[in-house]
Amino acid sequence: MSELDAKLNKLGVDRIAISPYKQWTRGYMEPGNIGNGYVTGLKVDAGVRDKSDDDVLDGIVSYDRAETKNAYIGQINMTTASSFTGVQGRVIGYDILRSPEVDKAKPLFTETQWDGSELPIYDAKPLQDALVEYFGTEQDRRHYPAPGSFIVCANKGVTAERPKNDADMKPGQGYGVWSAIAISFAKDPTKDSSMFVEDAGVWETPNEDELLEYLEGRRKAMAKSIAECGQDAHASFESSWIGFAYTMMEPGQIGNAITVAPYVSLPIDSIPGGSILTPDKDMEIMENLTMPEWLEKMGYKSLSANNALKY
């Protein structure tokens, strides 16, 4: 048992999050899960479709395409949480199946917190990649949410269309859509919650390079909001990881950009050497394995190697 879990157990908290299903993860609080904990991950993606004469259907299909891009969360009943992963939680790629890229990462910049400490800000791509590796993609599905399951998610999104004639552009329309997610890890996870911050917007010029520059500015704005939220609760964070997704639209297309942090339990057959009879040991196994070690033990090829994933 980790030192953190030993401390939490004394407070009556367990972070066990095991699904009785084979292959599929299940949503936090679904009946039959083992343990009172949850596992979360970071997903930001964007999808498009050609515009039809039905705005509602266009929104449904473009949202579905964002859900099924990269880390596969298709066919779920998504319910909305606020934006915290607290004493019951672990994050894929960080707390379990840790990505080596997390330990190699260098801060992009720092933000001063209410207590005078500096909060290092990192690119969240290693954590985004980690969720893809665990859930799999639409074409290569691994331990994704069970079809039709009820998955609690921290989520936000934006939908916008690009008219066939750019001269007809109206407020709320644009050339692209983008989304962003941040996870900030509490310095003292026995006292404070780690925190998600989500953002999304419409891009109103045809220049993609300018959008990328703009998103770097959004990262600084998000870092400032993280520090301010920490001040409100007198909570300090040890690091923040911020990632983006975007898509540019062709004339006559509609785009949807989403930011999602699903709260799930882990199927036992995704845990090498795991047993439904020893859920506490199962969580320890996943905590002690790095992502490359897990991929090797499961016989999976990396989906994110060589920067293969675009968000």
Curated annotation (Swiss-Prot):
The gene is hdcA. The proenzyme is a hexamer of identical pi chains; each pi chain monomer is cleaved to form a small (or beta) chain and a large (or alpha) chain by non-hydrolytic self-catalysis. The record marks 82-83 as: Cleavage (non-hydrolytic). It comes from Lactobacillus sp. (strain 30a). The modification Pyruvic acid (Ser) is found at residue 83. The lineage of its organism: Bacteria, Bacillati, Bacillota, Bacilli, Lactobacillales. This is Histidine decarboxylase proenzyme. Gene3D superfamilies: Pyruvoyl-Dependent Histidine Decarboxylas, subunit A (4.10.510.10), Pyruvoyl-Dependent Histidine Decarboxylase, subunit B (3.50.20.10). The keyword Transport does not apply. One of its GO terms (molecular function) is histidine decarboxylase activity. Its EC number is 4.1.1.22. It catalyses: L-histidine + H(+) = histamine + CO2. Its cofactor is pyruvate. InterPro entries: His_de-COase_proenz (IPR003427), Pyr-dep_his-deCO2ase_N (IPR016106), Pyr-dep_his/arg-deCO2ase (IPR016104), Pyr-dep_his/arg-deCO2ase_sand (IPR016105). One of its GO terms (biological process) is L-histidine metabolic process. Keywords: Decarboxylase, Lyase, Pyruvate, Zymogen. Binds 1 pyruvoyl group covalently per subunit. Substrate binds at residues 64, 82. The active site is at residue 198. Pfam families: HDC (PF02329).
